[in-house]
UniProtKB/Swiss-Prot annotation:
Coiled coil: none annotated. It comes from the Bacteria. This is RNA-binding protein CA_C3141. Pfam families: Ribosomal_L7Ae (PF01248). Keywords: RNA-binding. The keyword RNA-binding applies. InterPro entries: Ribosomal_eL30-like_sf, Ribosomal_eL8/eL30/eS12/Gad45, RNA_bf_YbxF-like. One of its GO terms (molecular function) is RNA binding.
Length: 79
């Protein structure tokens, strides 16, 4: 696992879904402890777009990977 995600990323559900739908996403990170419905929505869309998904154990850990001081449910590395 990487220590930090690259700078060209978006964090959060709305921005992640937007990036995937606009075909700007390269890779998707999802926290395993994110709300079930949210988790499934992002996972399904990422699979539909044939994107690589990386599962992170906790939202706190994903927040740290994103270099933010709060928890994050999803993040997308942009092309």
């Amino acid at each position: 696992m990487v220590n930090r995600l690259p700078k060209n990323k978006v964090v959060g559900m709305k921005q992640s879904l937007k990036a995937i739908n606009e075909k700007k996403a390269q890779m998707v990170y999802i926290a395993k402890d994110a709300e079930s419905e949210l988790f499934q929505t992002v996972e399904k869309l990422a699979n539909e777009h044939s994107l690589q998904i990386v599962y992170v154990d906790t939202m706190k850990e994903l927040g740290k990977l994103c270099n933010i001081d709060v928890e994050a449910s999803t993040a997308v590395v942009l092309k």
